[in-house]
């Protein structure tokens, strides 16, 4: 463990402890989304959003290096990246989730300063960006209508009966595309 936080606020301290325990429960062989349910899948969106925090809390460089190798093996020939690694759902290319191909190696590099993960992941990173460029219907934007994007997933401002937040899907995808570039 590398990251510690103690404050004068018991609620904040408990929150931080819960984040630590969440990482312990979810980082076994792949970064899973939740250990308490039968699902326990390696959702790429969960991994990319948590990678920076994971690297602050633990020496997660080897863990993510191994997982990025798994991700690269799961990537499709067209460069699209699965939403789950290992790919047991046969779904790929969703914005935010597929961007794990770029965001995870970048955050690991930023945390530990070793560019090897970038070198090892470069082909997959480039493949992901090429996939967007080759399949988009609008130059310089991420408009891949054939892919079921999740968007602003589990936002509090979602419509009744939906898990997708009110943030426009095109905006979310464009922001991820810009960040990944």
PLM features: residue spans?
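Active-site acid/base region of carbohydrate-active enzymes
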Residues: 2-18, 24-25, 31-49, 53-83, ...
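Hydrophobic alpha-helical segments typical of transmembrane helices
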Residues: 67, 104-105
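TPR repeat positional signature
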Residues: 105, 174, 178-181
